[in-house]
C-alpha cells in the first residue's frame, strides 16, 4: 500500500475525543470524502470511514460499493477507533458498520456520526458533504449582537410533516416562510429533525444525532429552508434530545456489544417509562459526542438555538423511579451530578462559540438556577419553559366561568416566582395530544364563548411577562388533536371564528413587536405592576407593562361572560390612554359592541394622591383590552371618530 490506510486520521487527532474536549467530532469520525497522497500515483480521492468501537473484536464497513460483503477496518493504535480509506467511494454511497463483539457475534450498525441517512424504514448511512452557500450573513451578524432577554420573542412551534403533509424542505421554504412572515412570529421552533425511525415519536427517539431526517430532503435542503427563514428575519430554534435514545438494535444501543454510550446498570442506563437508554454523561467520549451534536446544528445548519428536551429527566437519578430502582450520587443525593456538569459544559461552550444564540430548557421542576450563569452556580441556559404557568393557566381556562372566581389565585401565582428564571410561556404540542384535546375543545361553552375565550387567553399570554410559544394550528383554532400523519385543518382556517383568531394572532405579534413595554423588561420587576390582582368576583386581571424609557401599557383580561362597561381603575399617569387592542373587535369575529371609542382619559386624583389618576374602561366579555399611555395626545371630543 502506497497511501495512508486511515485516510489521514491519526491517534493524535482523537485525543480530544477521549478527553471530552473535542466538540467537533463529526469532522473526524464518520464518513468523509477526502483526497490523500499516494506515493506512486499522487493525489487520490475516496472516502475515509472511522467509528469508535473499543470493545469490538473486528469491524467492517459494508456498503453498496462492496455489495454489502464487508471491507475490514483496522484499529488506529491506542484509540479504540477503527478506520479505513476506500478509494473511489463518493457521495451518495450507502454504508453501515458490521461489528463483531467480544463473544464473536456480528451486529450491523448505522454510523453514529452519519450526516445523512436513508429514509425510514430503511436506515443505512449515506456518504455526504455539504455544497451549500449561505446568504444569511446579515442575520448572523445581528444575532451575535443581540440581547435575547430584552428583545421580542414569539415562537411558532412546528412539526414539519404535520404542518402541510408531504412538503419537502424546499417547498416549506416557500410556504412556511411566507405564512410565518404574515403571522409575524419572530422565531420558529422545529420539533426534532435529527433522524428517527418511528414517525409517531415526533422525532424524540433519535438514532442520528448528526443526520437531518431525510423524510423531507437532503441536508442541504434543510440548510436552504433555514437560510430562507433567516433572510425573512425569522430565527430558527431546533429541538435537541440528549436525555435518552431508543433501543433499536441497529443504532447506538450496545454499540460494540457493550454499554458504550449508555450506563450498563439499568438503574442508571434505562428509562423504563419510555423504553429507552440514558446516556452515560460521565464518559468523556459520550460528552464529546453530545456536545459535538449540539454544536453541529448551530455551526453547520445555522440554527439560532436549541430547546433541550426533558431536562428534568436528566437532572434527577430517581426521575420516574421507585425506591430501590435508582443509584444515589456520591453524596447520597438524587441529583445527577454528571448530567448537571454536562449541561453546564454544553451551554458554556455553545454560548462562547456562538454569541447571541438561545439555549432553552424544557424543565418541569423547581430545580434552582436553570437560567443562572454557570459562573454563578447555575445550569447556564438562557431561558426555561414556564411549565407552572402553563399548567395553572390551562386548568383555569378549562373551568366553567362561574367557577373561575374560586381559582383566581392560580392565575396570579406565576408572578410570585416570575423573576427566579428567564421564562418562556409555552402552549406546546404536549398540550394538544394524548387525549388532552385541542385548545378550543378544552373550553366550555358554545362556539362564541370558545373563540372569545381563546382570543382573551392568547392576549393575556402575550401581555404577561415572558416570551411566548404556541404550537402550530392554535393560531386558527384547530379543532382536533395534533396528528403527525396529516396536515393541519387548513380548510377551517378562514371560517368564522377561526379566521378572526388567525387575524388576532397576526395583530398580537405586530403590536407586541412594536411596543417594548411588552417585552423589554420581561425579566426585570420594573416591567410589571398589578392594577388589580384580586378581582376574583369578576374573573378580571389587570396590570401595567413598562419599558426602559417609561412607556406604559395597561392590560385587561375578562374571563367572565359579563362585560365590564364602566370598570373603575387607578392608573399611574393622567391623560389619554389609546386603545391598541380589543379582542371583541369585528376584525376578530367579536361583537364589536364593547370598546372605548379608541381611548380613555385618566383624570388626576386630588391631594394627597396627585401621583395617580383614575379612569373607567370597558372590558368586553371573554375579552382583552390593551391601552397605551399617550402623553402627547389630547382627549377626543364627543362625536370624534373612534374605534371600538
Curated annotation (Swiss-Prot):
Primary enzyme class: transferase
Enzyme Commission identifier(s): 2.4.1.18
GO terms of biological process kind: glycogen biosynthetic process
GO cellular component terms, A-Z: cytosol
Keywords: Carbohydrate metabolism, Glycogen biosynthesis, Glycogen metabolism, Glycosyltransferase, Transferase
Coiled coil: none
Catalytic activity: Transfers a segment of a (1->4)-alpha-D-glucan chain to a primary hydroxy group in a similar glucan chain
Keyword Transferase included in the entry's annotation: yes
SUPFAM superfamilies cross-referenced by the UniProt entry: (Trans)glycosidases, E set domains, Glycosyl hydrolase domain
Keyword Transferase: yes
GO molecular function: 1,4-alpha-glucan branching enzyme activity; cation binding; hydrolase activity, hydrolyzing O-glycosyl compounds
Catalytic residues (positions): 309, 362
Pathway noted in the entry: Glycan biosynthesis; glycogen biosynthesis
Origin superkingdom: Bacteria
Family matches, as CDD domains: AmyAc_Glg_BE, E_set_GBE_prok_N
SMART domains given in the database record: Aamy
InterPro entries reported in the protein's UniProt record: A-amylase/branching_C, Branching_enzy, GlgB, GlgB_N_E_set_prok, Glyco_hydro_13_cat_dom, Glyco_hydro_13_N, Glyco_hydro_b, Glycoside_hydrolase_SF
Similarity-based family: Belongs to the glycosyl hydrolase 13 family. GlgB subfamily.
Subunit and partners: Monomer.
Function: Catalyzes the formation of the alpha-1,6-glucosidic linkages in glycogen by scission of a 1,4-alpha-linked oligosaccharide from growing alpha-1,4-glucan chains and the subsequent attachment of the oligosaccharide to the alpha-1,6 position.
Protein name: 1,4-alpha-glucan branching enzyme GlgB
Organism: Cutibacterium acnes (strain DSM 16379 / KPA171202) (Propionibacterium acnes)
Top-level taxonomy: Bacteria, Bacillati, Actinomycetota, Actinomycetes, Propionibacteriales
Amino acid at each position: 500500500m502506497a497511501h495512508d490506510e486511515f485516510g489521514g486520521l491519526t491517534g493524535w487527532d482523537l485525543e480530544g475525543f477521549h478527553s471530552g474536549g473535542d466538540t467537533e467530532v463529526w469532522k473526524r469520525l464518520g464518513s468523509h470524502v477526502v483526497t490523500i497522497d499516494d506515493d506512486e500515483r499522487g493525489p487520490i480521492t475516496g472516502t475515509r470511514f472511522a467509528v469508535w468501537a473499543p470493545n469490538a473484536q473486528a469491524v467492517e464497513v459494508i456498503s453498496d460499493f462492496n455489495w454489502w460483503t464487508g471491507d475490514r477496518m483496522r484499529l488506529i493504535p491506542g484509540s479504540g477507533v477503527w478506520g479505513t480509506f476506500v478509494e473511489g467511494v463518493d457521495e451518495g454511497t450507502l454504508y453501515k458498520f458490521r461489528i463483531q463483539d467480544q463473544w464473536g457475534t456480528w451486529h450491523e450498525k448505522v454510523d453514529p456520526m452519519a450526516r445523512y441517512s436513508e429514509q425510514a424504514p430503511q436506515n443505512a448511512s449515506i456518504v455526504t458533504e455539504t455544497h451549500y452557500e449561505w446568504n444569511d450573513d446579515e442575520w448572523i451578524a445581528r444575532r451575535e449582537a443581540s440581547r435575547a432577554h430584552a428583545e421580542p420573542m414569539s415562537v411558532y412551534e412546528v412539526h414539519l410533516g404535520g404542518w402541510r403533509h408531504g412538503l419537502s424542505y424546499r417547498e416549506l421554504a416557500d410556504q412556511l416562510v411566507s405564512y410565518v412572515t404574515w403571522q409575524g412570529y419572530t422565531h420558529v421552533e422545529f420539533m426534532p429533525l435529527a433522524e428517527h425511525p418511528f414517525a409517531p415519536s415526533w422525532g424524540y427517539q433519535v438514532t442520528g444525532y448528526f443526520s437531518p431526517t431525510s423524510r423531507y430532503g437532503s441536508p442541504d435542503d434543510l440548510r436552504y429552508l433555514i437560510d430562507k427563514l433567516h433572510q425573512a428575519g425569522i430565527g430558527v430554534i431546533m429541538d435537541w434530545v440528549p436525555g435518552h435514545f431508543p433501543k433499536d438494535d441497529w443504532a447506538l444501543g450496545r454499540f460494540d456489544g457493550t454499554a458504550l454510550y449508555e450506563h450498563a446498570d439499568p438503574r442508571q442506563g434505562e428509562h423504563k417509562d419510555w423504553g429507552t437508554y440514558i446516556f452515560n454523561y460521565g464518559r468523556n467520549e459520550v460528552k464529546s459526542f453530545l456536545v459535538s451534536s449540539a454544536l453541529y446544528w448551530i455551526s453547520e445548519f445555522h440554527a439560532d438555538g436549541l430547546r433541550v428536551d426533558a431536562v428534568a429527566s436528566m437532572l434527577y437519578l430517581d426521575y420516574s423511579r421507585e425506591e430501590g430502582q435508582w443509584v444515589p450520587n456520591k453524596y447520597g443525593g438524587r441529583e445527577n451530578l454528571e448530567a448537571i456538569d454536562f449541561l453546564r459544559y454544553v451551554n458554556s461552550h455553545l454560548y462562547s462559540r456562538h454569541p447571541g444564540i438561545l439555549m432553552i430548557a424544557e424543565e418541569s421542576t423547581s430545580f434552582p438556577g436553570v437560567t443562572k450563569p454557570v459562573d454563578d452556580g447555575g445550569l447556564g441556559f438562557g431561558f426555561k419553559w414556564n411549565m407552572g404557568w402553563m399548567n395553572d393557566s390551562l386548568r383555569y381556562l378549562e373551568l366553567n366561568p362561574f367557577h373561575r372566581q374560586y381559582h383566581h389565585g392560580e392565575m396570579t401565582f406565576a408572578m410570585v416566582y416570575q423573576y427566579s428564571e428567564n421564562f418562556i410561556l409555552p402552549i406546546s404540542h404536549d398540550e394538544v395530544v394524548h387525549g388532552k384535546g385541542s385548545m378550543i375543545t378544552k373550553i366550555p361553552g358554545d362556539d362564541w364563548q370558545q373563540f372569545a375565550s381563546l382570543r382573551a387567553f392568547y392576549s393575556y399570554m402575550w401581555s404577561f411577562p415572558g416570551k411566548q410559544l404556541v404550537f402550530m394550528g392554535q393560531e386558527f383554532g384547530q379543532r382536533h388533536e395534533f396528528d403527525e400523519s396529516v396536515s393541519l385543518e387548513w380548510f377551517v382556517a378562514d371560517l368564522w371564528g377561526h379566521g378572526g383568531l388567525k387575524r388576532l394572532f397576526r395583530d398580537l405579534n405586530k403590536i407586541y413587536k412594536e411596543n417594548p413595554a411588552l417585552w423589554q423588561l420581561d425579566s426585570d420587576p420594573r416591567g410589571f405592576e398589578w392594577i388589580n390582582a384580586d378581582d376574583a368576583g369578576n374573573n378580571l386581571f389587570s396590570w401595567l407593562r413598562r419599558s426602559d424609557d417609561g412607556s406604559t401599557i395597561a392590560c385587561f383580561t375578562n374571563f367572565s361572560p359579563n362585560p365590564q362597561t364602566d370598570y373603575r381603575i387607578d392608573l399611574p399617569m393622567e391623560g389619554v390612554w389609546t386603545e391598541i387592542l380589543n379582542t371583541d373587535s369585528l376584525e376578530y369575529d367579536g361583537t364589536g359592541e364593547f370598546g372605548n371609542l379608541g381611548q380613555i382619559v385618566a383624570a388626576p386624583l386630588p391631594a394627597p394622591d396627585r401621583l395617580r389618576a383614575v379612569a373607567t374602561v370597558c372590558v368586553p366579555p371573554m375579552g382583552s383590552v390593551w391601552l397605551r399611555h399617550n402623553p402627547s395626545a389630547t382627549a377626543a371630543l364627543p362625536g370624534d371618530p373612534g374605534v371600538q
